[in-house]
Design a protein with these regions (language model features):
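Envelope-exposed proteins and targeting segments
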Residues: 91, 112-117, 176-178
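Short acidic, glycine/serine/threonine-rich helix-capping segments at coil-helix boundaries
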Residues: 192-264
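Active-site acidic/histidine clusters and adjacent loop/turn architecture
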Residues: 22-96
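Long, well-ordered alpha-helical scaffolding segments within enzyme catalytic domains
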Residues: 62-91, 123-167, 197
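N-terminal export leaders
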Residues: 1-5
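Surface-exposed patches in mature extracellular/periplasmic domains of secreted proteins
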Residues: 88-101, 130, 163-172, 217-220
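Extracytoplasmic and endomembrane cell-envelope/extracellular-matrix remodeling and assembly machinery
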Residues: 170-173, 179-198
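Short, surface-exposed glycine/acidic/tryptophan-bearing loops
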Residues: 104-122
């Protein structure tokens, strides 16, 4: 599981920043998994009340509520929260979600305790990041720009730790939360860009537009010329090298630069 912004070797040469703090350690290029969700009973999962230092709150009723996920998935959530706190300077004391495990037949990673639907991050009773696109998408243009910048900052951090990150761009059912799961690379896998992943490509396109101001990029889900040109230029200008498709190192460098750009805007 990734924990901090240390440096790790990648199979095939080069180095990848695989964590937020911690020693250098080798990692391999995690292969994609062909696994499917396995339905688990809630009794097989541990009861949890927080993600890192942030208590878990059920978004529907605003009450502190336990959630249930597998141990490895919980560790990745905690690592992401460390990344978020370190790179943004925010100190969320509450994370609102629609829950982790849900009972089902194994058609969703929620059924195996390897997914969470994140709605808001809050500090002292106030939002520091709202992923409730459904609530603010019709606000003033200036307010929507501000919220989109923060939204995609959070999404960038999630993409550092999870390969499957579904936003309002995926479909309307995700307009009130960001969904994360560990299905593509399995628990503890190191995410990287999969060029055929429409969700990943749309995310980097939205980051280009809403964080970097690259308005010539379209959120098409296709890794087209304008997207490649914009992301390569961002990498070049902010300490990275190569292209996003080069592997873990470039992927992480782009995402970390995006988080910092949103923070400093």
């Amino acid at each position: 599981v990734l924990g901090g912004l240390g440096v790790a070797a990648v199979a095939g040469g080069g180095w990848a920043l695989a964590s937020v703090v911690g020693p250098e350690r080798p990692v391999t290029m995690t292969p994609e998994s062909s696994a499917h969700p396995a339905a688990l009973d809630r009794s097989a999962l541990r009861r949890r009340t927080a993600i890192g230092d942030a208590r878990h709150v059920y978004e529907v009723d605003g009450r502190a509520t336990p959630y249930y996920v597998q141990d490895a998935f919980a560790a990745t959530l905690a690592a992401w929260m460390t990344t978020h706190r370190t790179l943004t300077g925010q100190r969320p004391d509450a994370l609102h979600s629609y829950g982790g495990w849900t009972q089902g037949a194994g058609t969703s990673w929620h059924h195996s305790g390897q997914a969470l639907d994140i709605a808001r991050l809050r500090t002292g009773g106030a939002d520091v990041a709202s992923l409730r696109y459904d609530r603010w998408r019709d606000d003033t243009a200036a307010e929507v720009r501000r919220r989109l910048r923060t939204y995609w900052q959070v999404a960038a951090g999630l993409h550092l730790h999870f390969a499957d990150v579904l936003t309002y761009l995926f479909d309307a059912s995700h307009s009130n939360h960001i969904h994360v799961d560990s299905g593509r690379f399995g628990p503890g896998g190191v995410p990287r860009l999969i060029p055929r992943s429409g969700a990943q490509v749309q995310a980097i396109q939205a980051m280009c537009v809403h964080v970097w101001g690259r308005t010539g990029v379209q959120t098409s889900g296709e890794l087209d010329g304008p997207t490649r040109d914009a992301t390569t230029a961002i990498l070049r200008d902010h300490g990275g090298t190569g292209e996003l498709t080069d592997g873990v190192e470039a992927w992480q460098a782009f995402l970390r630069a995006t988080i910092r750009q949103a923070r400093d805007a």
